[in-house]
Amino acid sequence: MYRKILAVTAMSMLLCGCTSGKNVVGHSTGRDDIGGQTPAEAALLTDSTEKVCYGQGYETDSENRPVGAMQAQEKYGAYGGEYIGDKNDKTIYLTFDEGYENGCTGRILDILKEKNVTATFYVTLDYVKSSPDLVSRMINEGHEVGNHTCTHPSLPDISDDMVFEEIHGLESYISDNFGGYKTVTMRPPRGEFSVRTLRLVKNMGYDTVLWSFAYNDWNVDDQPDIKKAYERITSATHNGAIYLLHAVSETNTAILADVIDYWQDNGYSVKSITE
């Protein structure tokens, strides 16, 4: 089922359109106090239920940062949405989506360990139940396990109570079965959200993490060419990048070590979202 969902919703990922402090990828919260509003919050006066099918698009600025990601950060960052990190931060935030296991995750973990970098793995309940040893490795080796919901629904299409159950159900299962581990960031299935779901997720203590880079890597039967994929990924490098890669991809697995080398050789740190 997860494979079908990925195939049906793939292109939307690319094209659709407290006190003062910083959030998980280094943005200023813009608040002077708990009750304060940022300009973005003031502009969005109601919890809109309009579904946003997010994608970073192809347009970039003079610093190679995707315009779509920057616009989304400006518009939705006040609600806990994370699309791109700070422009002055020479960091790559490396994330993987895990809906089912395709034999690649163990090798990905080996590479990350060899390169001494961490990543965030967004998992579903089915994945956690079917691959507990891999989830344990993620946690034990210092990576972040993120919440990708129990059943991978489009969050704007379900009720407030169901959104809560989708996120809290996975959170509770992971906590109960992995030594009290607490998930603190969430990636919305299919990259779909609304102001309503952003607020709900934020009220649960989560940031909603999207991305500033994603590409067509999820179809295991039609994998991208290795050389082209390497060029696509490295040429998109930018400060504060949030990379979404699918861990089912043999291509991603084959080039990951070289991609990390490229980033590090060019002065970038590679981290999980919360590191």
What residue spans do the PLM features occupy?
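Terminal accessory/targeting
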Residues: 1-92, 110-119, 239-275
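A broad, structure-centric signal for solvent-exposed, well-ordered loop/edge residues
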Residues: 8, 130, 135, 145, ...
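A short, flexible N-terminal coil/short beta segment enriched in small residues
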Residues: 42-45, 183, 190
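Active-site beta->alpha N-cap acidic-glycine motif
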Residues: 54-156, 162-175, 182-183, 269
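A cross-domain feature marking catalytic cores of carbohydrate-active enzymes
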Residues: 96, 123-126, 147-149, 188-190, ...
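Divalent metal-coordination and catalytic microenvironments
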Residues: 97, 112, 145, 186-189, ...
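Alpha-helical scaffold elements lining the catalytic groove of polysaccharide deacetylases
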Residues: 104, 153-178, 192-239, 252-258
